[in-house]
């Protein structure tokens, strides 16, 4: 069973909500999945206000008809202490390209110059060698078929460095709620699927970091989105160090059916390696989609929203505590922590803060 808690700001209140109806697959999972999304709206007291559910299905490359229901639970948590409210989500487009000029890499990507068999590491993309996909995060076509090598007709999705997000996805997305993203392979060469930008990676808002105060390294695994939604995009925070968290600029980033989306991270126990943790996990493994805690991060209308979210796949507390702390001179509305297996605020539903100026840290201690 898979948690899908992709966050998107909704309506005119400071509420984090996720419209995630995504096919998920990787090279270990070539099957047909019926993805069931259950979105829960939660008020400041932790009470569920509105439940909803939708489904989407797609066929895998090998044509197997093994149907798996993947329950998706989304926390929508009101920032009770927020002094401002978020504006209504845009519904004018199903996809929005990033307009930021901040990028990482060695320059602009040139269409048709790199073979599909070569991973474009020099362009800012980060190779994920442990997945066995030639460095790619996922390889999918518009029909939901997957492959283990980048080939004609497929979108080859990739990871970026911590604090950055990929820029490539086609404006035309599957009508059934799945998403695809990455460079497009055509006639053996790689092409941009989003020609509005020449870079492969774009910097996020820069308003959050992960700070590790425990003795072991922590593998934080972002979801491959738009794309497979597998939790394979790594941010590894060594003991006593920090790394930027990609806070998606929602107003200019990918939109799912006209709704803003933000970043989602699965956090493994301290000491779990990136190769063992940033994968599609198995039931009871405690890694990947079975990791003990999930983080959310997004920026819209001048406000950063940061969340600590329970993973319904894993009720066990992690081997660390975590809290969201304002940096010096910053303003954070609300309090959010997960200490000794207990969330602050309403208790078991997770918590959200709004950063109205400056930045904040996810502190692991």
UniProtKB/Swiss-Prot annotation:
Family classification: Belongs to the SUN family.
The job of this chain, per UniProt, is described as:
Involved in aging, oxidative stress response, and in the regulation of mitochondrial biogenesis. Inactivation of UTH1 increases life span, leads to higher resistance to heat stress and against hydrogen peroxide, and increases sensitivity to the superoxide radical-generating drug paraquat and to copper. Also required for the selective autophagic degradation of mitochondria (mitophagy) in response to nitrogen starvation. Involved in the remodeling of the cell wall during the various phases of yeast culture development and under various environmental conditions and plays a role in septation.
Looking at the keywords, is Nucleotidyltransferase present?
no
InterPro entries (UniProt xref): Beta-Glucosidase_SUN (IPR051526), SUN (IPR005556)
Q: Please name the GO terms that the record assigns under molecular function.
A: hydrolase activity, acting on glycosyl bonds
Record gene name: UTH1
Q: Does Cell wall biogenesis/degradation appear among the keywords?
A: yes
Coiled coil feature spans: none
Disrupted-gene phenotype: Leads to increased resistance to zymolyase treatment and to boric acid.
What other comment is given for this protein? Present with 56900 molecules/cell in log phase SD medium.
EC number(s): the record gives: 3.2.1.-
The induction text for this entry reads: Induced by hydrogen peroxide. Repressed by superoxide radicals and anoxia.
Tell me the domain of life. Answer: Eukaryota
Provide one Gene Ontology cellular component: mitochondrial outer membrane
Q: Which of UniProt's keywords are assigned here? A: Autophagy, Carbohydrate metabolism, Cell cycle, Cell division, Cell wall, Cell wall biogenesis/degradation, Glycosidase, Hydrolase, Membrane, Mitochondrion, Mitochondrion outer membrane, Polysaccharide degradation, Secreted, Septation, Signal, Stress response
Q: What is this protein called?
A: Probable secreted beta-glucosidase UTH1
Checking Pfam families in the record gives:
SUN
Signal sequence residues: 1-17
Primary location group: mitochondrion
Q: How does it sit in the membrane?
A: Peripheral membrane protein
Q: Which GO terms describe its biological process?
A: autophagy of mitochondrion; division septum assembly; fungal-type cell wall biogenesis; fungal-type cell wall organization; polysaccharide catabolic process
Where found in the cell? Mitochondrion outer membrane; Secreted, Cell wall
């Amino acid at each position: 069973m898979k948690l899908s808690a992709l966050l998107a700001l909704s309506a005119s209140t400071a509420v984090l909500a996720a419209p995630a109806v995504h096919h998920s697959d990787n090279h270990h999972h070539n099957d047909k999945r019926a993805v069931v999304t259950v979105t829960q709206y939660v008020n400041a007291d932790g009470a569920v206000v509105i439940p909803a559910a939708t489904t989407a299905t797609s066929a895998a490359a090998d044509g197997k008809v093994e149907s798996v229901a993947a329950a998706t639970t989304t926390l929508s948590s009101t920032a009770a202490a927020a002094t401002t409210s978020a504006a209504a989500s845009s519904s004018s487009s199903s996809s929005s390209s990033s307009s930021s000029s901040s990028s990482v890499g060695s320059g602009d990507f040139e269409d048709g110059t790199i073979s599909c068999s070569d991973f474009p590491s020099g362009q800012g993309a980060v190779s994920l060698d442990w997945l066995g996909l030639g460095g790619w995060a996922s390889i999918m076509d518009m029909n939901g078929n997957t492959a283990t090598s980048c080939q004609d007709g497929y979108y080859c999705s990739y990871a970026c460095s911590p604090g950055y997000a990929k820029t490539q996805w086609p404006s035309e997305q599957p009508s059934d709620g799945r998403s695809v993203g990455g460079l497009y392979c055509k006639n053996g060469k790689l092409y941009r699927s989003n020609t509005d930008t020449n870079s492969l990676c774009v910097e996020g808002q820069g308003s959050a970091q992960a700070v590790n105060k425990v003795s072991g390294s922590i593998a934080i695994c972002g979801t491959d989105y738009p794309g497979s939604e597998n939790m394979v995009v790594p941010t590894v925070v060594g003991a006593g160090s920090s790394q930027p968290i990609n806070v998606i600029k929602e107003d200019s980033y990918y939109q799912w059916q006209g709704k803003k989306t933000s970043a989602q991270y699965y956090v493994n126990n301290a000491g779990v390696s990136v190769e063992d943790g940033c994968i599609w996990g198995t039931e009871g493994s405690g890694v990947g989609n079975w990791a003990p805690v999930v983080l959310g991060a997004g920026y819209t209308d001048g406000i950063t929203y940061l969340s600590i979210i329970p993973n319904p796949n894993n009720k066990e507390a992690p081997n660390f505590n975590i809290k969201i702390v304002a940096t010096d001179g910053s303003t954070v509305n609300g309090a959010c922590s997960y200490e000794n297996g207990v969330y602050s605020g309403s208790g078991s539903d997770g918590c959200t803060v709004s950063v109205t100026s400056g930045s904040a840290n996810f502190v692991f201690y």
